UniProtKB/Swiss-Prot annotation:
Part of the ribosomal stalk of the 50S ribosomal subunit. Interacts with L10 and the large rRNA to form the base of the stalk. L10 forms an elongated spine to which L12 dimers bind in a sequential fashion forming a multimeric L10(L12)X complex. The gene is rplK. Gene3D superfamilies: Ribosomal protein L11, C-terminal domain, Ribosomal protein L11/L12, N-terminal domain. This is Large ribosomal subunit protein uL11. Coiled coil: none annotated. It comes from Desulforudis audaxviator (strain MP104C). The keyword Cell inner membrane does not apply. Pfam families: Ribosomal_L11, Ribosomal_L11_N. The lineage of its organism: Bacteria, Bacillati, Bacillota, Clostridia, Thermoanaerobacterales. One of its GO terms (cellular component) is cytosolic large ribosomal subunit. Keywords: Methylation, Ribonucleoprotein, Ribosomal protein, RNA-binding, rRNA-binding. Forms part of the ribosomal stalk which helps the ribosome interact with GTP-bound translation factors.
């Protein structure tokens, strides 16, 4: 018989740098999960993606065991990395803060495809372009 699910916890944690400190500790501690076991396993699984923020969905079972699924990094994080900027624009329609080529947007869309609710890559590209526009990043041909 399948284990009884007690809780679903969603967090965004820097890859390879999870620690028992907030936000991980309190989020998992209240469900009685072995925090160090999660931290060790998460850091091992995300060691190759250091520098990115990786969303993770943790399923906590009634016997206090857990399983987790890592997702692809948020489009905004990938766009900021591609444009070489630290923060997005506070006024995206007035102040542009960076530029990204259309080919780079397509690469990001293809990477994000498993987590996006898009029928094809073209729809995913339009979603990523919309995110870029709302961040004040200009999309240029190339």
């Amino acid at each position: 018989m399948a284990k009884k699910v007690m809780a679903m916890v969603k967090l965004q944690i820097p890859a390879g740098k999870a620690t028992p400190a907030p936000p991980v500790g309190p989020a998992l501690g209240q469900h009685g999960v072995n925090i160090m076991a999660f931290v060790k396993e998460y850091n091992e699984r995300t060691a190759g993606q250091v520098g990115l923020i990786i969303p993770v969905e943790i399923t906590v079972y009634a016997d206090r065991t857990f399983s987790f699924v890592t997702k692809t990094p948020p489009a905004s994080v990938l766009l900021k990395k591609a444009a070489g900027i630290e923060t997005a624009s506070g006024q995206p329609h007035v102040k542009k803060v960076g530029k990204v080529t259309r080919t780079k947007v397509r690469e990001i869309a293809e990477l994000k495809m498993p987590d996006l609710n898009a029928a094809d890559v073209e729809a995913a590209v339009r979603m990523v372009e919309g995110t870029a526009r709302s961040m004040g990043i200009e999309i240029v041909e190339g």
